[in-house]
């Protein structure tokens, strides 16, 4: 990454940030985080009969098999009596996964804020701090999302492990493409955050490289004291003062730094004349 130019880092961080924002937005708004299917095993020919199949998101549950086929309900109403779920574990899964909902929402807000700040920083690259701020927001957005994903997975695993085993019933579940989009957006947002922070360090190093060193500043005498705290750059020193002024200042400094000549009495004067 040390060989990447600032333009390449700007382009890559923008692309990664835009893709991360798009994927997490699609994931939050769609209903394909989890697929679940329940049924019974027929003992005669060992075939299965699907009793209920659904796909669930953060906001809705939609049934595509069973008695409720073709029906979608909001997540907070899936426990209504008229909805026929085969086992209580399915209800518990749909209930516990709601604890993970706030984290993807916070992640979506943070990545949107980071994307806006990042674009402002690209438009005005002289504001170096914006790249650093956007990188921090990208990283925080990814961390918030991964916390939500971990809670989502752990809630499902806990309910599946507590599910009683039965030879007459079966239960299958798998994660959908909305969940895959959310996981992919985590990688993209972390990548955008790392590149934004690196872009900040690169721009800051370039500013320090072209900034004049303090040793190139020289003091200027003021009217109120012999040593002034005001400083000018060498170019400004030569441009702002004429040669006669500079020579007069140098002569003043020399007279102030050297002691006056010693005067001897007249009677101690020794003549060097041969007469």
From Swiss-Prot:
Residue ranges of the TM segments: 8-28, 103-123, 129-149, 179-199
Gene Ontology BP, a term: regulation of AMPA receptor activity
A Pfam match: Claudin_2
Record PTM Phosphoserine, positions in chain: 222, 225, 273
Top-level taxon: Eukaryota
GO molecular function, one term: channel regulator activity
Protein's job: Regulates the activity of L-type calcium channels that contain CACNA1C as pore-forming subunit. Regulates the trafficking and gating properties of AMPA-selective glutamate receptors (AMPARs). Promotes their targeting to the cell membrane and synapses and modulates their gating properties by slowing their rates of activation, deactivation and desensitization and by mediating their resensitization. Displays subunit-specific AMPA receptor regulation. Shows specificity only for GRIA1 and GRIA2.
Name this polypeptide is given: Voltage-dependent calcium channel gamma-7 subunit
Organism annotation: Homo sapiens (Human)
């Amino acid at each position: 990454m040390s060989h990447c130019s600032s333009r390449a880092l700007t382009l890559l961080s923008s692309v990664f940030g835009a893709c991360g924002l798009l994927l997490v937005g699609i994931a939050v708004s769609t209903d394909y985080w989890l697929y679940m299917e329940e049924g019974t095993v027929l003992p005669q020919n060992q075939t299965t009969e699907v009793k209920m199949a659904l796909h669930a998101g953060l906001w809705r549950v939609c049934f595509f098999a069973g008695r409720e086929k073709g029906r979608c309900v909001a997540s907070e109403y899936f426990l209504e009596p008229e909805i026929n779920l085969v086992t209580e574990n399915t209800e518990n899964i749909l209930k516990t996964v709601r604890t993970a909902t706030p984290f993807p929402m916070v992640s979506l807000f943070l990545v949107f804020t980071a994307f806006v700040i990042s674009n402002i920083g690209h438009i005005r690259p002289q504001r170096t701090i914006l790249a650093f701020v956007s990188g921090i927001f990208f990283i925080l957005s990814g961390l918030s999302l991964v916390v939500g994903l971990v809670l989502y997975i752990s809630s499902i695993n806990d309910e599946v492990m507590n599910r009683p085993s039965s030879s007459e019933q079966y239960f299958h579940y798998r994660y959908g493409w909305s969940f895959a989009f959310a996981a992919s957006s985590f990688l993209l947002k972390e990548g955008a955050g790392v590149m934004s922070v690196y872009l900040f360090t690169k721009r800051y190093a370039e500013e320090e490289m072209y900034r004049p060193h303090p040793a190139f500043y020289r003091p200027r005498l003021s009217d109120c004291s012999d040593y002034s705290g005001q400083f000018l750059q060498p170019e400004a020193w030569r441009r702002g003062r004429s040669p006669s002024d500079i020579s007069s200042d140098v002569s003043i400094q020399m007279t102030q730094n050297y002691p006056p000549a010693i005067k001897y009495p007249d009677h101690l004067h020794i003549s060097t004349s041969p007469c």
